[in-house]
Amino acid sequence: MPALITHHLFGEESIDRLPQGVITSDEERIAFILGNQGPDPFFFHILTPRVSDCTLLAQVMHRSRMSRQFACLRDGVSHLLPRDASLGRAFALGLLSHYVLDRNAHPFVYEQQFGIVESDSELEDSSSQVHAVIESDLDVLMLQLKRDGATVDDYPPAGEIVTTDRINRVAGVLMSYVAGRVYGIDIPAGEYGAAVANMQRLYRAIEPAGSAKTRAISLVEGLVHDYSLLDGLAHRVTTELPERTGNLGHLTWKNPFTDEVSNESFPEVFDRALVDYGCTVARFIETGDMDAVTGHVNYSGRVLEADEEFDREE
């Protein structure tokens, strides 16, 4: 990821990069914004017998076969019932928006994550928790910048996840289609809507960071892990900008996958991703050339070989 709030804010702006007339109703707008959460809801779908398959789907969609994934998604929209096609297209374009932000933003996040873990050997097995804390801080930063200094008290993260039964049904069909055709994973269509509901439920439970209920959950999780992932996902209530995490001082950093050197702040990475989305979504809609759409870059920002196989987490 970036995390929930940043993806939502990105969707609110990336929707304006779509060709005129693509989004024609409020429900299509909701579907597009929800699509901006990408495969991430499946990471939160722990209250299902299919938890391992759902987690695996979220992982493999992020790391591999991106061109086939989006080709299948586009094909899936073409097979929907005519009354559902526009809604499915809106969701698919939102999922593409999630991917474009991820591939631009993740090198920024991973550069910090790798540096923090390398500097403290005790964090070696806690990369996911470090990743979550960085992205939570970026959520806090972007919420303040995009919504006039707002905090998660003003905009609770769970409230940013909006859907309808119809969107869940159509999006579920598309995600099930991609899971089976591209990755050979059997995910019934109903699992997507349940995953979204579980994502909402979890954020209601853990927010805000530092609350009594969050501390209690963290203590329980601490019986199993050295550091709490759920505590890392929760957002701080603060009016102080996370300047260091967002690199607002424009220190030099290096893309860990390409070695490209930059002094961009995170807000500048966000804006660069918006420009990228405008170009990428035009290719997706007009040409269907998915190699050109993805450039064989996965959601982490790692450039893969032409077969786009990659079998490990960063």
Regions found by a protein language model. Give the residues of each.
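N-terminal leader/auxiliary helical segments
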Residues: 1-94, 99-314
